Design a protein with these regions (language model features):
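Intrinsically disordered, low-complexity Pro/Gly/Ser/Thr-rich segments with frequent PxxP/GP/PP motifs
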Residues: 210-231, 589-612
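Accessory beta-strand-rich segments of carbohydrate-active enzymes
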Residues: 5-6, 11-20, 39-153, 186, ...
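Short, solvent-exposed loop/linker segments at the N-terminal edge
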Residues: 159-175, 562-564
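Beta-strand-rich binding/interaction modules
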Residues: 79, 170-215, 569-595
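Extended acidic/polar, glycine-enriched regions
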Residues: 103-108, 180-273
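Extended substrate-binding grooves/exosites of carbohydrate-active enzymes
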Residues: 26-31, 37, 82, 88, ...
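Terminal connector regions
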Residues: 248-252, 257-261, 610-628
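Accessory carbohydrate-binding/adhesion or oligomerization-edge regions at the termini
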Residues: 1-40, 114, 197-201, 482, ...
Length: 628
């Protein structure tokens, strides 16, 4: 937030190499991509956007900027004919353009933006080496933001539970809190007023709500709050996503408010120890599904927030706890994951075997994307890991060197999160694959389809033997049509067969099934234009479930329910998934029955006769039907 913020949602738009094309512009609303329109679905090149802005009163020395939440891809920004900024090589990370010197107060200002989605060997994704849509445009919101002469940026927050012992979930207790932020103020005597509140931003009123902690710090270029111990923090968990809000107010010496910021955080710890990982002290095995955004043909990568929410709900409704994104998502997506409980690995879009040989030439853009991604999203408790690449040639030394360098870079920037590489080559020679250089070995397992010549059990055993005492996650498994036959029935059987095997290996701490949905991709085998896709999902392009969706939902439920004489037996799964159920409620016949806390392997008996309305509610409000 800032002193003034305005969404710039209505623009004039046209395709062409120069802004002259705007003489025949159409009026559009942001977010927007030209590749979701029938007349331009195959267009690769430049698009031009034009709008006007008339700022009202701003204080003396005010700073103004445009915040782009995502523009795909190479972007130039002009204000009143002045080139104010460029952002090349990255289409999914947010960026800010300072327009202070070009902006005229109390007058109409012309804003002109060009966006170019031509395939590039200087960008990530690299050239044509990526398996999703090449949708160009202002695909996410654009905001005008103004502050006083001093402003805040790059706030880093530590919100870490103090776990007293490992082996059982801890819901609340002691926690460490600290933060550091940067200011661009050269004005002596500025102060930073801060306060920590319990609750999400929309549930607090800073002037009326009582903060848990607060204080005033003198401002320099770097402002730092030393760690503070909270005695009774409620920990963030995917079933109980408890949020806190850090409010920052930057004041000038005369008391004038120059900038503000509100960041939602959560206290949670995810720790890898040996061949297990622990969430807030509990060893867990977590079920996951990946969703490929941008797949509704009429919206593309410019999906509305209502559509994004529909697909996120689709993830939650099939009992997903863990997911990953091949490319960076809008901050709003992670706000949703924070509030409703999803664990996420966010990745830079470095995908496939291109460029051949040494990827060193891409280090500058990879480094910049990792910095932009971490800076924008590190406060989100839902994000547990960063990804440095997917399906590169990780059996070669140059790629392994890149992976090690990227993992080390992330650890330096964010030591509280995991850094991983996702491999599709690990079965070929397990001991020399780059997957081992991440904190977790993330393995794309297409044995039986893309990966020919391997037997499931022996291939995995060789991989585990090559990396003893490590955590593994099958990060993709599923069926891609029409490359492979069998349709949705085979998709369901592959899911069941793979999951049954994964359950036998204790070192597999989670799974990420691929894919939630059929997805649009420029390299798809089915359809044309905006309909070009891969049939890989348990829903269609629009999110309509196929029969295999129910299979995933049933197998990923944390409770197994069976009929027994006199009622039902509820057993907390002890294979995969495996985590404590706490605060769950059984709903039946218009009544609710609290289920006692059950650790993996424990059972509870309910006396009665279930009817068709029977369902189980999580404490987060999501529910699932028992498989009776």
């Amino acid at each position: 937030m800032a002193l003034c913020q305005k969404h710039l949602s209505i623009w004039n738009f046209a395709l062409g190499d120069s802004p002259d094309c705007l003489s025949h512009a159409n009026k559009i609303h942001i977010p927007h991509t030209w590749n979701s329109r029938k007349y331009s679905e195959n267009y690769v090149g430049k698009g031009w956007y034009q709008t006007t802005l008339t700022p009202g009163f701003l204080p003396e020395g005010a700073k103004s900027c445009l915040v782009f939440h995502g523009a795909y891809r190479d972007t130039e920004v002009y204000v009143n004919g002045v080139l104010c900024g460029q952002h090349f090589g990255s289409g999914y990370t947010p960026f800010t353009v300072d327009i202070t010197s070009a902006l005229r107060l109390h007058e109409e200002n012309e804003i002109l933006v060009s966006v170019d989605n031509r395939f590039s060997t200087d960008a990530l994704p690299y050239d044509r080496s990526f398996d999703w849509a090449n949708d160009g445009g202002l695909i996410r919101p654009v905001d005008f933001v103004a502050t006083g002469p001093a402003s805040l940026r790059d706030t880093e927050i530590t919100a870490m539970p103090v776990i007293s012992s490992y082996g059982k979930r801890q819901h609340a207790g002691a926690a460490l809190f600290s933060f550091r932020t940067k200011t661009d103020s050269s004005i002596p005597g500025c102060t930073l007023h801060w306060a920590l509140f319990r609750g999400a931003t929309d549930s607090i009123t800073p002037r009326e709500s009582e903060p848990l902690l607060s204080g005033i710090l003198p401002c320099t270029e770097h402002v730092h709050l030393d760690p503070v111990l909270l005695s009774d923090a409620v920990y963030w968990h995917f079933d109980r996503p408890e949020l806190y809000t850090l409010a920052l107010h930057l004041e000038l010496p005369d008391g004038f408010l120059s900038d503000t910021s509100f960041l939602e955080i959560g206290f949670r710890e995810l720790k890898v120890m040996g061949e297990r990982w622990f969430l807030n002290g509990e060893p867990v095995r977590l079920p996951g599904v990946e969703w490929m955004p941008g797949s509704t043909p009429t919206l593309g990568m410019a999906e509305s927030r209502s559509k994004l929410q529909d697909m996120l709900l689709c993830l939650k409704d099939c009992n997903t706890v863990l997911t990953r994104f091949h490319w960076q998502q809008d901050d709003w997506v992670y706000d949703w994951c924070d509030r409703y409980g999803l664990l996420v690995q966010e990745e830079i879009p470095f995908w496939g075997k291109q460029p051949e040989g040494d990827p060193e030439k891409l280090w500058p853009v990879a480094c910049r994307q990792m910095e932009e991604m971490i800076s924008a999203h590190r406060h989100h408790p839902s994000i547990i890991a960063w990804g440095v690449g997917n399906e590169l040639s990780a059996q070669t030394w140059p790629v392994q060197r890149y992976i090690r360098r990227a993992v080390a870079f992330i650890h330096e920037k964010d030591p509280d999160r995991l850094a991983n590489y996702v491999s599709n080559t690990a079965f070929a020679c397990p001991e020399q694959d780059g997957a081992g250089d991440g904190d977790i070995l993330m393995i794309n397992d297409y044995i039986g389809t893309w990966h020919q010549g391997f037997e499931q059990s022996s291939a995995w055993q060789a991989l585990v033997d090559a990396h003893p005492g490590r955590v593994f996650i099958p990060s993709e498994f599923g069926l891609c049509e029409p490359a492979f036959e069998g349709g949705d029935p085979r998709r369901a059987s592959i899911f069941l067969e793979k999951l049954a095997f994964y359950r036998t290996l204790p070192c597999i701490a989670g799974t990420i099934y691929f894919c939630l949905n059929d997805y649009r991709t420029h390299m798809g085998e089915e359809g044309k234009g905006r309909m070009k896709c891969r049939v890989h999902g348990s829903t269609d392009l629009y999110g309509t479930p196929k029969p295999s969706y129910e299979t995933v939902s049933r197998e990923y439920a944390p409770l197994m329910v069976s009929r027994v004489p006199g009622g039902l037996s509820f057993t907390c799964r002890n294979d995969l998934p495996a985590y404590t159920v706490s605060g769950y409620v059984f709903c039946c016949g218009g009544q609710t029955f609290p289920i006692p806390d059950l650790m993996p392997g424990e059972s509870w008996f309910w006396e009665g006769t279930p009817d068709d309305s029977a369902c189980i509610e999580r404490p987060s409000g999501f529910s699932f039907s028992p498989a009776l």
